[in-house]
Regions:
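Active-site region of the double-stranded beta-helix
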Residues: 1-48, 68-72, 76-130
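Histidine-centered metal-chelating micro-motifs
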Residues: 19, 51-64
């Protein structure tokens, strides 16, 4: 499971199928969605007959599986003041009955180094003098 402490997710499926589980720890409630470009099912019942964006706020546990045919989606995520790249992509083991969770993978391990690496110290020094 993922849970973003500082990011709200706004997911729209453009092609294929996405299976999305969400879990609210405060309410201890789970919901399952099947999302296609033109329909949304909630807990296996038609929820909306048309294109839609599925939205969940920060702090909600979620997991997503692409359908057998694959899928294309966009997530227009928004960041809150609590956003930190260091913990945004952590992966958790979640007990949906008790709401207890534990970190099983530090998401920062999967993030790229965003610092530019100069090819040599001479270029770095010349650039810094500018």
């Amino acid at each position: 499971w993922y849970m973003h402490p500082g990011q709200d997710d706004n997911l729209m499926v453009l092609q294929g199928t996405r299976y999305v589980d969400i879990f609210c720890q405060k309410k201890k409630e789970k919901a399952s969605f099947i999302i296609t470009p033109d329909k949304v099912y909630k807990n296996e019942k038609l929820y909306y007959d048309g294109p839609a964006m599925i939205v969940w706020p920060n702090g909600i546990f979620h997991r997503i599986i692409s359908g057998e045919e694959g899928s294309i989606s966009i997530n227009l995520s928004t960041r809150t003041n609590d956003f930190k790249l260091k913990d945004n992509f952590n992966i958790y083991d979640l007990n949906i009955y008790s709401g207890e969770y534990r970190l099983i993978r530090d998401g920062s391990d999967d993030q790229p180094n965003l610092e530019y690496v100069f090819p040599n110290d001479e270029i770095k020094k010349l650039f810094k003098e500018m």
